[in-house]
Amino acid sequence: YLEFEILMDFVFSNRDRHLTNISVLRDADSLKFISLAPIYDSGKSMMVGRDIVPLTDKYVLSQEAKGFKDNEIELLKYVQNRNLVDINKLPKVDYIKEMYLKDSQTSEERIKFVCEMYERKVDMLDKFASGADLRAIRNP
C-alpha cells in the first residue's frame, strides 16, 4: 500500500504525506474495515502554492516532501514494485486541464504549468517503472 501511495504522491506532486494523513475505508453501517484509502489528504498536490518557473528535469525531480523523507527521490527508494501504478489508467493531461479550466480563479499560466509538470511526472514515473535511476537524471 505505501509503495502505491508514494508513487501516486510522486505523480501528483503531493508533498505532505505523513502518518496522520493516511486513512482507511470502512463500511458506513458496520464500520468494518474495507481497505486503506488509495488517495487521501492530497491538498498540497499539483503544485499548489508553488511559484511558476521554467520546468527542467532537475526541478521536476527536486520536489520537497514533508513527513517520511525530505524529498520525493528519497521516498522512491522505498518502492520495490515499480510497476504498481498503471500509467495508462492515470488521467490524461487534457482531463487535468479541463478540470482546472472550470476554476475561473486559476490563470492560464498556472494551468499550463500544472499540466506540464504532470506530464513530466508521468514520463518520469514511466522511466522509473522501466528501471531508470531518477537520481542520475536529476544530478547528471
What are these regions (language model features)?
Residues Y1-N14, L19, S23-P140:
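Anionic ligand-binding catalytic core segments
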